[in-house]
Amino acid sequence: LAESGLANRWSATPFHFYGNSGENFTNARLGGIAKVSTGIVLVGSSAPSMSEKFRKENQQLFIQIVSPVTQKSMLSGSRRKGSSCGSSRTDTGVKWLTNYKDASVTASAVAIMERQQILVLWEKESSAGTESYYMVLSPTGKILQKATRIGKISLNACEEIKYKNGCVYWTTANGKKTASVHKLYIGKFK
């Protein structure tokens, strides 16, 4: 973590993507970044492999919590090896939150709740359509609330979700100049 006046800069590459620099197809999306007492939280979706087979894999939801000081993962998640930008890479502490065989995660988001709890929302896309879900994790990555179905409500991949007083808020648009504000009661966890 580098400090410069009022701003802090953190530089690390804890999660790698298969392929060469400049490739547009990564089969992955960053959902968001947040800070908790145990480190920097990364939430996103990706094909689990760092090999050519990633092109045929469904995107799964993942979380990493990385120390801004040591740049090491704070989770005891899985380890994955492969190639990224022409070099051999190893990602450690990747906790996969989904394992869909017939669906993909198409969007995800993260917010921090009271007591440093991590709120994760995502969209699951399958042949039956798109549905959204949420789960709550502790600052150490322990699942406090298992995947809970929200329904056929989209997330906004271009805007962060907001959490306040037990509720999460986000907006979507239907393409007809109409915006919808969504409010979901999550509650507070001990």
Task: Enumerate the predicted regions with their spans.
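Extracellular, repeat-based ectodomains that mediate carbohydrate processing or recognition
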Residues: 1-190
